[in-house]
UniProtKB/Swiss-Prot annotation:
Mg(2+) binds at D8, E59. One of its GO terms (biological process) is fatty acid biosynthetic process. It catalyses: apo-[ACP] + CoA = holo-[ACP] + adenosine 3',5'-bisphosphate + H(+). Transfers the 4'-phosphopantetheine moiety from coenzyme A to a Ser of acyl-carrier-protein. It is found in: Cytoplasm. Belongs to the P-Pant transferase superfamily. AcpS family. One of its GO terms (molecular function) is magnesium ion binding. This is Holo-[acyl-carrier-protein] synthase. It comes from Rickettsia africae (strain ESF-5).
Length: 131
């Protein structure tokens, strides 16, 4: 059963400006601990694109849940990692998911300066009603 679909587009220059003003604060605000470790390993030239993709991905996932960021789910409740082939893997905090049946989140990310886009689909094998 389809639970929801979400998409988001982020202007990478917007994230560059935020990073210039708040170099550490912004990353700590939107990244979960596992993502912060990945972020620390990147060269500074890749920071804005990484953050833009994570921001867009988390917005898309929250929209697919039908709630949006700050309305039942927060940036740090969603972790975006990559498998060995680079496929995005989504982990959602048990604080949010413990009331839901098992589900799968499919996420696609793309960036081509100056934009990045995220598209999320959430599905379940059970009948679930959100909201």
């Amino acid at each position: 059963m389809l639970i929801g679909v979400g998409t988001d587009i982020v202007q990478i220059p917007r994230i560059e400006k935020i990073l210039h003003l708040y170099p550490e604060l912004f990353a700590k605000k939107i990244l979960a601990s596992k993502e912060l470790k990945q972020f620390a390993l990147l060269g500074k030239i890749n920071h804005a694109a990484f953050l833009a993709k994570r921001f867009a991905a988390k917005e898309a996932v929250s929209k697919a849940f039908g709630v949006g960021i700050g309305q039942g789910i927060n940036f740090k409740d969603i972790t975006i990692l990559n498998n060995d082939l680079g496929k995005p893997i989504v982990e959602v905090s048990s604080n949010y998911t413990n009331t839901l049946s098992p589900f799968n989140i499919h996420l696609s990310l793309a960036d081509d300066y100056p934009v990045c886009v995220a598209f999320a689909v959430i599905e379940s094998s059970y009948n679930v009603i959100l909201g």
